[in-house]
Swiss-Prot record:
Binding locations of [4Fe-4S] cluster: 43-44, 129, 132
Paired cysteines (S-S): 211-213
Gene that specifies this protein: queH
One GO biological process term: queuosine biosynthetic process
Organism: Staphylococcus epidermidis (strain ATCC 12228 / FDA PCI 1200)
Protein name listed in UniProt: Epoxyqueuosine reductase QueH
Amino acid sequence: MIEANQILAKMKNQKINYDKVLRKIISQWERDGERPKILLHSCCAPCSTYTLEFLTQYADIAIYFANPNIHPKSEYLRRAKVQEQFVNDFNNKTGASVKYIEAEYEPHKFMKMAKDKGLTEEPEGGLRCTACFEMRLEIVAKAALEHGYDYFGSAITLSPKKNAQLINELGMDVQNIYNVKYLPSDFKKNKGYERSIEMCNDYNIFRQCYCGCVFAAMKQGIDFKQINKDAQAFLQQF
């Protein structure tokens, strides 16, 4: 199966459009009659909306909800449940067979990483975010390798607030460490983000007000008592 490096090698000395890279990879799958298995990291249901609508045309997808950065635990559980609900609703509506896998909640690993690297005071979008992206990409790469997926990737590139160039560069670096192929993407391209908003409305999906990181949330002035109260109220429905 084709690796992104085979395409990227032909694109030296130019800014890389990772959406075009993804589409070239997909075209090769179609020429070869392949339908790969992809383990796709998702930070939240909204980021997985258009991403699944697009990718399920060409591949078998499992959503991997692995986000040790999310605080508090009740908010993690709420986002996980919303993600699981969306996968089920999407499958029922489209006839797809997307799998949902939820990682163990391990916030201590994120906290230790941020403190050990001296990143707790970094602004959102700074070095702490880079380390967080890399940490989660490594988690999904390890799981993809362990469970025999052809590719690993992330739905985070749907967000206009996240640096897709950086995320893809990190993904390619992680690919070089683990023996599993990274699937590059920039899902917000071609009106992907706009389509995600439409799908959130269609599926009545909860859209969170902060990324999840406790350090960024404190600087943002997030009211954790209210977040916890709202999350607990949501979870009591199940």
